[in-house]
């Protein structure tokens, strides 16, 4: 069911250390492939970059990794876990009780993080494949042509997204060891190149970071931060993957990962100092520091690391969407569980969307340099939203002093605000693609959240106690044939004995549904990820059963599985009579047949509704046409199901005036009378 159930959540193990390599650090671990390259290009290339720019950029990278990744996420954010689960939606569930407006940063951050999921696989795989240009044979055959790079990248992405439906448990077992080799490889090569110029170590002094931002030698100005930020884009994913590996394993493994990453950047900086001023064309410092004998190996290893980073992000996107669905921030989508572990999700619609978006980005931008110009903008938004939610969490924590909360908020809003401002220019250089995608996701979230509020506003309720006698007479009325032994209604609104009025209309008015037992089931999603509990109220009868299911936001909402257990428990306790079942392949079966009734609300005659509310509900109806059916979502595809359409809003017809048209013949006849 997931590593989060391990009792050693706060402890570190050797296996957990390796697992963390493959799951948590894929994104941040591939940043050395393109971060320094982006900085060099922003400074005018190898020919024009200055020593101050190299040392200053390295200092900015070191302190960005320290302040944002280490301090904010590893030291602080990892403590804000929701029953061992991390990420922006888990953080939201911890603080949403304090203020309704917190839904806004949660939706904005979630939408931005999902949109980034399309760009990350494209930029990481492209950056790795571009390393082929460092191989003489490849360079002689294709030169600086980008088409072969694009074709290879598209092929790798196609394979990556196509295998998702089969699960990744087998290949996932090698992710950790491969990433451990990857980190060790570029850490060691960085250390070797560091011996070429130890002067880069002065970058540890934050003076050089500040000096670069103010220096006239900095040709990119404040916008250099847009490239520097690429070094820490994986920090948000680190927090999101908390539930997969545990806090202890992240705390122990991060120092190793950070040292390797910084050594890689130091090695690249040392090489740049030795070769600045030379005309070497478009070079990637990551591959340039390597001897020719290691180029092929490094490209293969970098490609594997890029695939692993992309896989981790794709899996993270599946988890993020499933959480948003259960928090009623996104429509229901079909979710499959292809692996042996419950935590392995596969959402076909999300997989297809990410694949198409990533492929479009590769074709549209062509090179990793162009992608890097658009990369990072969405993550700065997510980090700002996380800072807001995390501040509220810390403010409500009794052990945290208020002065620390103020300092935390002020410091990280300022730092991340600078990164956002520096990255905003990326909007004009392709960032608009990610912004448009994030805006579309946010639009759907806003519509879904608001429509849910309107649904409860217009839904009418009735008291079941007022209709118990009628329902009892109906179940005993011999003039009606038995509809089904058990009739089950799934309802979104049930407060004790008060239920959706449309359900009673379906039972008594449409076509009286005679049954031995009437079930009313409501699913309540809890803030805990793996809750599975229920409450039963039979209203003093043995034929009405009101069931409140309490399921964690990571649990499958498969109603028949839970209902079988509840029926058995009620019969064993004597609260529910045994049901005679003469024909069955199960000897001695004492539970009758079930019919599930799903009521589908349609917006009808909503002219009296405000225009905005009408737009929201009509938009939701259009979105629902391409989402998973309630029957599939609730695991009813192998059960007997009836779907009935009922009006959500119906104007009072008694206020409508209509007059009978009388013909001349009838008028004469009426006068004669």
From Swiss-Prot:
Name this protein carries in UniProt: Probable potassium transport system protein Kup 1
Compartment list: Cell membrane
The keyword Ubl conjugation is annotated on this UniProt entry: no
Transmembrane portions of the chain: 14-34, 58-78, 101-121, 147-167, 175-195, 196-216, 220-240, 252-272, 294-314, 345-365, 374-394, 403-423, 427-447
Residues of the signal peptide: none
InterPro entries linked to this entry: K+_transporter, K_trans_C, K_trans_N, Kup
Family: Belongs to the HAK/KUP transporter (TC 2.A.72) family.
Superkingdom, natural source: Bacteria
Main location: membrane
GO cellular component: plasma membrane
MF annotations from Gene Ontology: potassium ion transmembrane transporter activity; symporter activity
Protein role: Transport of potassium into the cell. Likely operates as a K(+):H(+) symporter.
């Amino acid at each position: 069911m997931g590593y989060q159930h391990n009792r050693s959540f706060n402890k570190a193990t050797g296996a957990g250390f390796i697992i963390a390599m493959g799951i948590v650090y894929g994104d941040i671990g591939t940043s050395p492939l393109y971060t320094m390259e982006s900085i060099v290009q922003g400074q005018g290339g190898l020919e024009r970059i200055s020593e101050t720019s190299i040392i200053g950029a390295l200092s900015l990278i070191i302190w960005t990794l320290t302040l944002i990744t280490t301090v904010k996420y590893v030291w602080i954010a990892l403590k804000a876990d929701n029953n061992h689960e991390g990420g922006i939606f888990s953080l939201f569930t911890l603080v949403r009780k304090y203020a309704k407006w917190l839904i806004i940063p949660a939706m904005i951050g979630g939408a931005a993080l999902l949109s980034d999921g399309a760009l990350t696989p494209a930029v990481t795989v492209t950056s790795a494949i571009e390393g082929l240009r460092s191989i003489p044979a490849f360079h002689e055959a294709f030169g600086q042509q980008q088409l072969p790079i694009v074709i290879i990248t598209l092929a790798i992405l196609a394979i990556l997204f196509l295998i998702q439906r089969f699960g990744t448990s087998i290949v996932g077992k090698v992710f950790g060891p491969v990433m451990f080799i990857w980190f060790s490889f570029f850490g060691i090569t960085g250390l070797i190149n560091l011996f070429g110029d130890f002067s880069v170590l002065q970058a540890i002094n934050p003076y050089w970071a500040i000096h670069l931002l103010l220096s006239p030698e900095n040709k990119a100005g404040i916008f250099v931060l847009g490239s520097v930020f690429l070094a820490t884009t994986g920090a948000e994913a680190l927090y999101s993957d908390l539930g997969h590996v545990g806090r202890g394993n992240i705390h122990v493994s991060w120092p190793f990962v950070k040292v390797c990453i910084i050594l890689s950047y130091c090695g690249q900086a040392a090489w740049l100092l030795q070769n600045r001023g030379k005309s070497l064309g478009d070079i990637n410092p990551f591959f340039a520091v390597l001897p020719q004998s290691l180029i092929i190996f490094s490209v293969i290893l970098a490609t594997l690391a890029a695939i692993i980073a992309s896989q981790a992000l794709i899996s993270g996107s599946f988890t993020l969407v499933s959480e948003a669905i259960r928090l009623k921030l996104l429509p229901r989508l079909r979710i499959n569980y292809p692996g042996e572990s419950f935590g392995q999700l596969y959402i076909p619609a999300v997989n297809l969307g990410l694949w198409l978006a990533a492929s479009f980005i590769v074709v549209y931008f062509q090179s990793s340099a162009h992608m890097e110009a658009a990369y990072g903008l969405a993550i700065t938004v997510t980090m700002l939203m996380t800072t807001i939610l995390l501040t509220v969490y810390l403010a409500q924590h009794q052990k945290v002093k208020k002065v620390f909360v103020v300092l935390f908020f002020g410091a990280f809003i300022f730092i991340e605000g600078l990164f956002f401002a520096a990255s905003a220019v990326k909007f004009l250089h392709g960032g608009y693609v990610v912004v448009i995608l994030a805006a579309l996701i946010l639009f759907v979230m806003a519509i879904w959240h608001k429509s849910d509020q309107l649904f409860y506003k217009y839904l009418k309720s009735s008291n079941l106690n007022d209709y118990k006698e009628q329902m009892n007479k109906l179940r005993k009325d011999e003039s009606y044939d038995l509809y089904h032994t058990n009739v089950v209604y799934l309802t979104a609104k049930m407060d004790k004995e008060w239920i959706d009025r449309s359900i009673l209309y379906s039972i008594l008015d449409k076509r009286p549904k005679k049954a031995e037992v009437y079930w009313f089931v409501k699913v309540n999603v809890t803030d805990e990820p793996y809750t599975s509990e229920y409450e039963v109220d039979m209203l003093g009868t043995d034929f009405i059963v009101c069931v409140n299911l309490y399921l964690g936001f990571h649990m499958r909402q498969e109603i028949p599985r839970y209902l079988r257990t509840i029926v058995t428990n009620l019969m064993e306790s004597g609260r529910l009579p045994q049901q005679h079942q003469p024909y069955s392949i199960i000897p001695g079966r004492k539970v009758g047949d079930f019919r599930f009734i799903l009521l589908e609300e349609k917006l009808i005659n909503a002219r009296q509704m405000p225009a905005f509310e009408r737009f929201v509900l009509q938009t939701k109806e259009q979105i629902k046409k391409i989402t998973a059916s309630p029957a599939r979502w609730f695991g009813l595809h192998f059960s007997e199901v009836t779907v009935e359409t009922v009006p959500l809003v119906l104007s009072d017809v008694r206020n409508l005036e209509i007059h009978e048209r009388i013909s001349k013949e009838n008028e004469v006849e009426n006068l004669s009378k």
